[in-house]
Amino acid sequence: LGLTLVPADIRTLSQLHQAIDPLPGDIDAIFMPHDAMLASNTRAIVAVAAVRGVPTSTPHREGVAQGALFSYGFNLYAVGRQAARLADQILSGTPATDLPIETAELDMTVNLAVADYLNLSVPEDMLRHARIAGRVGE
């Protein structure tokens, strides 16, 4: 695909800043994998990306509301509800081994305001598959 990855092993907030600050000036995008530490610092990552005019993807829809271009992943609220329901079943006496294996529902979210800011057009087929395709905060 002609991609060059610039991986960063990030476990602390200081490592996050050490990884973001020296990013090459010619990067085309920032991809954030599923990671609680990165998710809790999405605003900082997106702020750097916005200054550089670089699109960012996150694994959760909440990251799009914080300024990422798009996400394909889980909804934190829905995952919390799912976890609470399963915890309630276990606390009510259902053995954990009797619970079915469940995965979180994945969806795509697109931030059209960020696309406009970055002067990017979002393909119609991508918008058709997006669960939410709106402006910041929608």
Where are these regions (language model features)?
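Short hydrophobic alpha-helices and adjacent helix-cap/hinge residues
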Residues: 1-138
